[in-house]
Amino acid sequence: MAGGLLQLVAYGAQDVYLTGNPMITFFKVVYRRHTNFAVESIEQFFGGNLGFGKKSSAEINRSGDLITQVFLKVTLPEVRYCGDFTNFGHVEFAWVRNIGHAIVEETELEIGGSPIDKHYGDWLQIWQDVSSSKDHEKGLAKMLGDVPELTSISTLSWDVPDNTVLKPSYTLYVPLQFYFNRNNGLALPLIALQYHQVRIYVKFRQADQCYIASDAFKSGCGNLQLDDVSLYVNYVFLDTEERRRFAQVSHEYLIEQLQFTGEESAGSSNSAKYKLNFNHPVKAIYWVTKLGNYQGGKFMTYDPVCWENARENAAKLLLLAQYDLDDWGYFQEPGGYECEGNDGRSYVGDCGVQYTAVDPSNPSEEPSYIFNDTTTAEAFDGSLLIGKLAPCVPLLKRNKDVDLKDKVEGIIRIHTDFENDRMKYPEVEKITRNDLTLHDLSVPISKYDVDNRVDYIKKFDVTVWQHNNFGLLIDGSGNPTHEAELQLNGQPRQSKRGGIWYDTVNPTVHHTKSPRDGVNVFSFALNPEEHQPSCTCNFSRIDTAQLNLWFQHFTNHKFADVFADNDNKVLIFAVNYNVLRMLSGMAGLAYSN
């Protein structure tokens, strides 16, 4: 007997539960016929000029019967530097990461003059983090502008021609996430809204919050303007019979809305309590913390593509910062003003520079100068001088931490003009020790107690905006939430849990993807991404709801004054169900706030 037949006749009482009275077969495809329809994406335009810092609306024309997906099309301008480079120096520029989400401050859906739902750029980023498939990451990165050609730092040197292009023009396609955008079964029936107009509002962020740049760029960039803004709306065209049915009957849709009560201050303490003024059956709560450091703070280096490169670049800048250089990075004559070191002594030169004699007259080999080790530094004799910061004079230091110059060592090559018998400029040939950490790179310049870097090096500082950074460090790592507890009517909804429970365990259980650090989820639903309800908590019937947060402990820690800051903000969102009714050509919500 064949093995397959042996399996077939091995049939017992338990098999009745599996194959008794069968309802399907795996060997005959069964499909269902659908109604006849067609889909076309049609461009819709905003009224008036819509640019950075402005708000406008697009009226959705009745070009089809239903609408589903909507994409916000934004064309970023070509970025050129048009200023007087000789007056300002080092020019650096990059668009922020996920500029497609970051550029949107808020977007709102309105039907018949009544607001139905409002989303925010931060929420669009959070929702993508938890719900997008890894298979779509490459495409979404292109659509949202999270590509190296936009986010990597572009640099201009002093000897470039005017109007040099820093970034090319680029077109973004930002998917909106209103209830009918995410589920074809909830397509918005324009054919049933004969007397109500549908509008979508968009408000953009200010331009200077959408890029990372040095002071030199900001002094000569001019006003950045968006080249083109519109909506691409997917219209569904129905066959005659279904079209008539949609137009004549009333409709009642179970929809999803977003609730957001505004930014809350995290304060400078280790804990905070937030009252949740939410309504309706809520399926999930999401919260993030945005550190003020990364919302307009100035840093000495930035490289979102590779933070190891940023660490190396910071070491090079710290090595060069100890030389007495002019505004173009060349050696300047010794002298200048006096400054006082930690030992109380006065040092002559640019912020306490010690001068060591160097002889450039030997053309056989350009000299190398070993930094940060005065006992083994090579001695040179000659008439020209170079400067090195005196060991007792701090370079870039916080009172609670060591001087950053003590964390790096390297070999510096001195470029020399032998014909004119003079020193030209230093260049880092090799980094021999680099003890800088991401914590060091995450400290904004304003939070250093001492900054004795020469002005030339300060020109490399960049102002950073990271709208998608919900972590502790500049690379987005670390959850600011140490522990959390949700209370309903004064009672804990569940026991206090660690931050990893909310930004790792809960998203892994309830969502498609584990998000970046700091995106915290409390889900009442089994499957919060699905439209089918799978448990909610009716906040309309809760008298008091409160989210208690304990932030990462920095008490008596050397970084306490860096990460515990009054500029830190907590953003709390809730996704709820509501009912949208359509009758006699008009629409309205069944339950208001």
From Swiss-Prot:
It comes from the Viruses. InterPro entries: Capsid_N, MCP_C, MCP_C_sf, VP_dsDNA_II. Gene3D superfamilies: Adenovirus Type 2 Hexon, domain 4, Major capsid protein Vp54. Keywords: Capsid protein, Virion. The keyword Signal does not apply. Pfam families: Capsid_N, Capsid_NCLDV. GO terms for cellular component: viral capsid. The keyword Protein transport does not apply. GO terms for molecular function: structural molecule activity. It is found in: Virion. This is Capsid protein 1. The lineage of its organism: Viruses, Varidnaviria, Bamfordvirae, Nucleocytoviricota, Megaviricetes.
